[in-house]
Amino acid sequence: MRLGIVCGSFHRDEVERMLEYARDEAASKNWEVADVAWVPGSMEAPLALDRMLHRDEIDGAVVLGIIERGETDHGLVMGQSVTKAVIELQITHNKPIGLGIIGPGAEPEHIEPRLEPHARAAVGA
């Protein structure tokens, strides 16, 4: 299995750690991380995923990111939009995509303990 991983860079330090957990999980399954793409945030992930999944050498993908709770419903709307787009991309390309986005609505104190389990679960999906 050759994976592509799309990472949202809005919380870059935390997402870099998620990427390392995802790489480790892929290696434990003898899977190859064939490509990593960084995008500004979770909202830009679907386009990067679409481009990645068009490539024959990519068998599946993972998206990693964090959507914190804000003062408005923007994060919730963004999370729903990204999730819907990811599901549509899986169907369109007939390739699995593991969703490793923490949130929407994550409080700062909830982010740290979720980094590893979300990243590893996304690879396993």
Residue ranges and their predicted role:
Residues M1-P40:
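Glycine-rich phosphate/diphosphate-binding loop of Rossmann-like nucleotide-binding domains
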Residues S9-F10, I66-I67, I101-G105:
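Short, ordered loop/turn segments at secondary-structure junctions
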Residues D35-R51:
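N-terminal beta-loop-helix "entrance" segment that forms/cooperates
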Residues V36, G60-L64, P96-I102:
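Short beta-strand segments at enzyme active-site cores
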Residues E44, E68-R69, P104-E109:
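Short, active-site-adjacent cap segments at secondary-structure transitions
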Residues L47-V86:
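Glycine-rich phosphate-binding loop
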Residues G75, Q80-A125:
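C-terminal binding/interaction regions
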